[in-house]
Amino acid sequence: MDLQTKLEQLFQQNNDTIKKVKSLDELNQIRVQLLGKKGPITGVLRGMKDLSAEERPKVGAFANKIRDDLSAVIEARKAQLEQAVINAKLASETVDVTLPGDPVEAGTPHIITQIMDDLEGFFMGMGYQVLTGPEVEEDHYNFEMMNIPKDHPARDMQETFYITNELLMRSQTSPMQARTMEKHDFTKGPLKMISPGVVYRRDDDDATHSHQFHQMEGLVIDKHITMADLKGTLLAMCQHVFGKDRTIRLRPSYFPFTEPSVEVDVSCFRCGGKGCPVCKYTGWIEVLGAGMVHPNVLRAANIDADVYGGFAFGLGPDRFAMLKYGIDDIRSFYTDDLRFLTQFSQEG
């Protein structure tokens, strides 16, 4: 029997065997036996040394074809067996897609985060940038550029966590305003920004004070900015947060970085201004401080105070949340009590 006939018989015999294999392990054994170094095809190729020079290329090419054909049959059977394994597994693990799913309990943003996100969205809608800065700040930006030099008595108003003589934990988010004013190109338009974040002061923690709390400060610098612009902005913001029927009033106050300075009260949203314990029977609730940017603050940032002016305001998201939801202890925000926090689950 010549080698070519022997190869044809080898293919026919094993083709049928391969198609009847029932497992991947058995198929792998056949593959090794047929196509391995000790397999019959390799044996045929070794016997080619006894062939003539004319027969050798023909038999070699035919042997390679038989090996490729057997490999193809093995791969086809392998794919069938693998699919059969998958089908069997799917059949044993059938899921009824018509059954209701098990709901996963969803978390929700912290109430302070919700308040801050809402305020940021409001001011972004009015064209403000949202800019954040470092919590470890330079004394220069935290105080001096805010018209509070080292010997200024107003420094006694803020007990500060100092790290070194020139580094501190920021006591307000105003430093980001100073940094931005230094770099802003007013030839490209006005500066409108808010700077939200965490601030630190050496307060004793109690129901209304915390050594760490949140603040959001706003700043607008341009030509021809007036107190009317400030009042309109704050009225819109208070109505957005506390209700469209709210009104505000401005009371004279003092802040080193604004002149004139005002405290902003909103008409009580509990009693409608009639008087109640929330507003201490005055009909008004103090919500934030504001004012027109002091010329010294503009000059410190190399802005011409004779050409440009602006307003600034600072509010506490913690206080806003306490007022809006009737919370009487600021420490509740930081105790991680889920019974308290889940009351403010965000919808959507």
UniProtKB/Swiss-Prot annotation:
One of the GO biological process terms: phenylalanyl-tRNA aminoacylation
Enzyme class: ligase
Keyword DNA-binding: no
Gene name as annotated: pheS
InterPro entries per record: aa-tRNA-synth_II, aa-tRNA-synth_II/BPL/LPL, Phe-tRNA-synth_IIc_asu, Phe-tRNA_ligase_II_N, Phe_tRNA_ligase_alpha1_bac, Phenylalanyl-tRNA_Synthase, tRNA-bd_arm
Cofactor: Mg(2+)
A GO cellular component entry from the record: cytoplasm
Family: Belongs to the class-II aminoacyl-tRNA synthetase family. Phe-tRNA synthetase alpha subunit type 1 subfamily.
Compartment(s) where it occurs, according to its Swiss-Prot or TrEMBL record: Cytoplasm
Principal localisation: cytoplasm
Cofactor, free-text remark: Binds 2 magnesium ions per tetramer.
Subunit structure: Tetramer of two alpha and two beta subunits.
Chain residues that bind Mg(2+): 259
Gene Ontology molecular function: any one: catalytic activity, acting on a protein
PROSITE patterns in the cross-refs: AA_TRNA_LIGASE_II
Keyword Nucleotide-binding (UniProt): yes
Protein name (record): Phenylalanine--tRNA ligase alpha subunit
Alphabetical list of PANTHER family matching this protein: PHENYLALANINE--TRNA LIGASE, MITOCHONDRIAL, PHENYLALANYL-TRNA SYNTHETASE
